[in-house]
């Protein structure tokens, strides 16, 4: 989508591997493997696609991929050797400091891992120093107080988000919320409590 008021595009953090059974659930393997061949560990390769929305007054990044600070054992397990988000943003003429809002649709590691990074001293810091991080309050509460069934869905990536709160970059919202004119966060059933999508309207589109 692109017009004189807004542009919307995909910016990739690369790919990762996830267990095919976890991805397709009740769908029999004999059906899904026709289109997605698993590796020897039954993992299928998925894209880590983030969305970049550019309006006349704001740059908005939707989700951040896995990021670069996961331990080597985790990178190997998920087949994600390095983060490509910053490089691909630069290809779009955007630096981390240019991002005004980071919208995290939910807080599983493959969506929020790149929200923070490690500096040269080993400290966890926000990846986007000037951005407000927009998160549903229900998603935040669930991530930091998960029930026993939800614990495996979250990782250190969530704990690292505390630094965003400490630096006053956290913007918790409740329900459908307009981020900037024409760009709205909309709560929608998904993989976790407080999951949301982002809608963009401009020029009659």
Question: Regions from the language model: what does each represent?
Answer:
Residues 1-7:
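Basic/polar N-terminal segments that are highly enriched at the extreme N-terminus
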Residues 36-41, 121-122, 185-186:
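Short, P/G- and charge-enriched loop/turn segments at secondary-structure junctions
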């Amino acid at each position: 989508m692109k017009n004189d008021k807004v542009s919307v595009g995909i910016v990739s953090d690369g790919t990762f591997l996830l267990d095919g059974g976890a991805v397709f659930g009740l769908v029999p393997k004999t059906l899904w493997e026709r289109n997605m061949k698993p590796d020897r560990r039954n993992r299928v390769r998925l894209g880590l696609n983030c969305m970049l929305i550019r309006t006349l007054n704001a740059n908005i990044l939707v989700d951040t991929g896995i990021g670069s600070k996961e331990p080597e054992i985790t990178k190997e397990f998920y087949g994600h050797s390095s983060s490509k988000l910053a490089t691909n943003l630069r290809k779009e003429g955007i630096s981390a400091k240019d991002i005004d809002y980071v919208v995290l649709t939910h807080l599983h590691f493959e969506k929020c891992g790149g929200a923070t990074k490690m500096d040269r001293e080993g400290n966890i810091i926000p990846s986007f120093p000037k951005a407000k991080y927009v998160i549903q309050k229900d998603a935040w509460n669930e991530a930091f107080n998960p029930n026993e069934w939800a614990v495996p869905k979250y990782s250190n990536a969530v704990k690292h988000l505390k630094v965003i709160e400490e630096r006053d970059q956290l913007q918790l919202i409740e329900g459908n919320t307009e981020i900037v004119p024409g760009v709205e966060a909309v709560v929608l059933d998904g993989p976790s409590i407080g999951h949301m999508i982002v809608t963009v309207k401009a020029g009659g589109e």
